Amino acid sequence: MRRRGHVHLALRRIAAALACVFAVASTTAADAPKHEIQDPHYGDTLFHFFQDHYFTSITTLMVSEHFDRVPHHADEAEVLRGGMLLSYGMQREAGEIFAQLIERGASPAVRDRAWFYLAKIRYQRGYLDEADAALAQVENHLPPALEEERGLLQANLLMARADYAGAAAALAAMPGKTPGARYVRYNLGIALIRAGDSARGSAVLDALGQEKAENEEFRSLRDRANVALGFEALTENQPKAARGYLERVRLKSLHANKALLGFGWAAAALKEPKLALVPWLELAQRDVGDSAALEAR
């Protein structure tokens, strides 16, 4: 269930990037080439994709490619297929697709997206130098949604090298009113805390942790911010504050187990052992593969 949620969020971001591609294309000058669907089978793939029928979308696309039904959108189709495979955790297969697009001299827009996704794959696999090298190949042809993700990826690479101050500076310089601004703020809060500025970082996360969230993606991010706040408060020997933050987390969210574990620790620190047992007993009945559930056993 948890893995499915992460896949869905990743695919939503691909959808946002695709939407940006078509939006930018629709507002270009009259003499510029229009981004129109010339192959009906590619249009069918996009229809399923934007309806959130991702499995149908990728299988339809693979069949269409096999029978050479998307000749006018061959590179775009490969970027889409690679992005979906990456979202499903198939990093090797996705990486091969993006590498082939680069090798065969795809258009600058396609090439930039291929390099970006290669950088993302390498970061996820822990190849930081290779991820940096791939990201450095990206020029200025990314759609706005991916340009924002590029900034987030760069900040994550800095944090992976423990350059938290550098990551915080990079994140603080990013635009504040964008579709992914909440992710920027979340990462900024984490970077500030790890850079030693707990007060500022916690303030950023606290604001995010109390915001109204219009969909599950942002509700999950809000829960994540509150869990981070709770554990930072525990680190700072503030169990009462930690409990307040962790109480905001939904019991059925992706981050509920960690929140329950932290809530128990907060209660124990406040000399309330009976109250600590309540979340820990609940955790003991949950998924044995979850680290928080295992720690409560």
Protein language model features and the residues they cover:
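Acidic, polar-rich low-complexity tracts and alpha-helical solenoid repeat scaffolds
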Residues: R2-H8, T27-R297
